[in-house]
């Protein structure tokens, strides 16, 4: 028996060594952790239970029978994050470059199936050179099996992708279908075709970092939700994100201890909105002052900065936040901000996360680039996302709520439950100046008359009371009491239930 146990430990030690110490040292030399080190940092200490440690590939072409490392380049299993079960796979770049084989894919599919059966999130750590060319179509078939699991798990359990090395070719489509993608600066890359192919086909000279690095995907393409300085920071932030999320679509998000009085009054909010309606202010200040202990987890911070998305807690419960940012493009909606917010709203709705919308929006950004780029269809995505949402929704209008953008941003007309407005709110078709120039175009040559007409319009419409008179705003509240009012509103909506008409699926304007 002793010999058998020793043999088992020898096999385990060899499997844990991956591609060998030389390749582990090379991985560390690039500033990267190994697959197992990443899993250990991601999960609670000692909680990881590994599956299929000794699985090997079955390929015999190109002398592959002589290279059969245990585990086949991916570490899979389950563990806990703050005591809650998650399933994880971590590709091992030290083993055949982390390349994806048939059995490599089967290991990933196995834990994804288990995650769906048991209602737990899936976290994938990607660090792979791509398909294992020696296996040909078997490798591609493996990709397809993983893709199908991504699709079936979407909206059922949260899926999080961590890009911690190369992720190229067909491999990029699995992370692309997950809920969140995180990258590491200077060491992670995502692209369908690499720099060499780009140069051959288009004659463009571009580096891997420029083509598919963390900066590109967080600021330009919006493929990634955040980028971090190193592996350790990225893993810590994913642990933090998981703590905001439910395990699956049938559970509520976790309730965490809080020490911040939900009835806290914040007098500084009374002066947050400047007297001049054209002067910007930072909407994040309001978000931090509403949140328990001021804690805000922002999603896609570097992309479409004219809208803010992320998670806070109120009374220890997760709330998704969507807010216009007056500091950028005056808070206008455009193509990018509409796409960004729509995807976030749909995620929250899929996983029963209540939505708080903070509005200061003068309209949709005008211009040929927006119209040619399809702002109509992209703006409709956000409209559609809010209109189909059935989670508790609370809206606060802080200043401007003009035109179609007002309707799109979780208005009462889209079934928002509570719609509050500050006294500084202006709910109108458009700003006073633009409206006056249309209504009184015959007086445009008389500055005094135009000034008087503008003042009259402002007095009549540049306030929240017309909308309040019609029931489109539930109450005009004091800014200082916003946290209290919002917290009480969400507390009253915890048992909300909405019946939707039967449909096979919707047809959102993609």
Curated annotation (Swiss-Prot):
Keyword Ligase: yes
A single MF term (Gene Ontology): propionyl-CoA carboxylase activity
Boundaries of every CoA carboxyltransferase N-terminal domain copy: 1-257
SUPFAM superfamilies to which the protein is assigned, alphabetical: ClpP/crotonase
Entry keyword annotation includes Ligase: yes
Top enzyme category: ligase
Pathway(s) where this gene product acts: Metabolic intermediate metabolism; propanoyl-CoA degradation; succinyl-CoA from propanoyl-CoA: step 1/3
Domain CoA carboxyltransferase C-terminal, first and last residues per copy: 261-504
Gene3D superfamilies per record: 2-enoyl-CoA Hydratase, Chain A, domain 1
Catalysed reactions, as listed in the record: propanoyl-CoA + hydrogencarbonate + ATP = (S)-methylmalonyl-CoA + ADP + phosphate + H(+)
Recorded superkingdom: Bacteria
UniProt region (Carboxyltransferase), positions on chain: 1-504
Region (Acyl-CoA binding): 292-325
Keywords: Ligase
EC number from the UniProt entry: 6.4.1.3
Chain's role: This is one of the 2 subunits of the biotin-dependent propionyl-CoA carboxylase (PCC), the enzyme catalyzing the carboxylation of propionyl-CoA/propanoyl-CoA to D-methylmalonyl-CoA/(S)-methylmalonyl-CoA. Within the holoenzyme, the alpha subunit catalyzes the ATP-dependent carboxylation of the biotin carried by the biotin carboxyl carrier (BCC) domain, while the beta subunit then tranfers the carboxyl group from carboxylated biotin to propionyl-CoA.
Protein family membership: Belongs to the AccD/PCCB family.
Domain notes: The beta subunit contains the carboxyl transferase (CT) domain.
Quaternary structure (record): The holoenzyme is a dodecamer composed of 6 PccA/alpha subunits and 6 PccB/beta subunits.
Full protein name: Propionyl-CoA carboxylase beta chain
């Amino acid at each position: 028996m002793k010999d058998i146990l020793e043999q088992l430990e020898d096999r385990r030690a060899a499997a844990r060594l991956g591609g060998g110490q030389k390749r582990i040292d090379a991985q560390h030399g690039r500033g990267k952790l190994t697959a197992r080190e990443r899993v250990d940092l991601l999960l609670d200490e000692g909680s990881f239970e590994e599956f299929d440690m000794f699985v090997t590939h079955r390929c015999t072409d190109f002398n592959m029978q002589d290279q059969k490392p245990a585990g086949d380049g991916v570490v899979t299993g389950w563990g806990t994050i703050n005591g809650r079960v998650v399933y994880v796979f971590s590709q091992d770049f030290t083993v055949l470059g982390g390349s994806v084989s048939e059995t490599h894919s089967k290991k990933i599919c196995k834990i994804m199936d288990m995650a769906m059966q048991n209602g737990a999130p899936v976290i994938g750590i990607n660090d792979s050179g791509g398909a294992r060319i020696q296996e040909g179509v078997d490798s591609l078939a493996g990709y397809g099996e993983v893709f199908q699991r991504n699709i079936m798990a979407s909206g059922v359990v949260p899926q999080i992708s961590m890009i911690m090395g190369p992720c190229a070719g067909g491999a990029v489509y699995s992370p692309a279908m997950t809920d969140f993608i995180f990258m590491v600066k200077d060491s992670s890359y995502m692209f369908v075709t690499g720099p060499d192919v780009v140069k051959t086909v288009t004659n463009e000279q571009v580096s891997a970092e420029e083509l598919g690095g963390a900066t590109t995907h967080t600021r330009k393409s919006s493929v990634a939700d955040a980028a971090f300085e190193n592996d350790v920071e990225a893993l810590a932030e994913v642990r933090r994100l998981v703590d905001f999320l439910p395990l699956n679509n049938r559970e509520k998000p976790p309730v965490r201890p809080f020490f911040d009085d939900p009835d806290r009054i914040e007098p500084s909010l009374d002066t947050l909105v400047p007297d001049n309606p054209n002067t910007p202010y930072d909407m994040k200040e309001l978000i931090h002052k509403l949140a328990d202990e001021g804690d805000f987890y922002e999603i896609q911070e570097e992309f479409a900065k004219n809208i803010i998305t992320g998670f806070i807690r109120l009374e220890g419960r997760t709330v998704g936040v969507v807010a216009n940012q007056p500091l950028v493009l005056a808070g206008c909606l455009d193509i990018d901000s509409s796409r960004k917010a729509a995807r976030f709203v749909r995620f929250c709705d899929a996983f029963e996360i209540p939505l708080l919308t903070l509005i200061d929006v003068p309209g949709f950004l005008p211009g040929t680039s927006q119209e040619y780029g399809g702002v109509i269809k992209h703006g409709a995505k956000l409209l559609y996302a809010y209109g189909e949402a059935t989670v508790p929704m609370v809206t606060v209008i802080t200043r401007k709520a003009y035109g179609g953008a007002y309707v799109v941003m979780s208005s009462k007309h889209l079934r928002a439950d509570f719609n509050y407005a500050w006294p500084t709110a202006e709910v109108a078709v458009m700003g006073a100046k633009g409206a006056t120039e249309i209504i009184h175009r015959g007086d445009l040559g008389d500055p005094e008359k135009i000034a008087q007409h503008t003042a009259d319009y402002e007095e009549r419409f540049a306030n929240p009371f017309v909308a309040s008179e019609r029931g489109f705003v539930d109450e005009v509240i004091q800014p200082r009491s916003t946290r209290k009012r919002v917290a009480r509103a969400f507390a009253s909506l915890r048992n909300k239930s909405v019946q939707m008409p039967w449909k096979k699926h919707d047809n959102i304007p993609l």
